[in-house]
Amino acid sequence: MDKRILKLRQQIDELDEEIILLLKKRMGISKEVGKLKEELDIPVEDKTRENEIIDRLTQQAGRNLSEEQLIRIFTAVFKSSKQIQHWVTTSKQTNIFW
């Protein structure tokens, strides 16, 4: 294998590790949001917030990430976050995924 490809793949692997750490951190915060939503009797689903996030991130994405790609990625992130929040609001357990 060409050394240049290996070097680039190594960079991708390092970024993947950073993404995992950030996703874990995001899901931990989502868990806390779920607890507060339960306490305040606020629904988990908040399409307005999701649209605000997509709009903000679309402006930041630039040329290497299309709006369609960004929406697909963050739809999955939102789905996972909402699953955690639903889990927190329907269960008294507090140890999910970590």
Segments predicted by a language model, with ranges:
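Domain-level signature for soluble enzymes in the chorismate/prephenate branch of the shikimate pathway
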Residues: 1-98
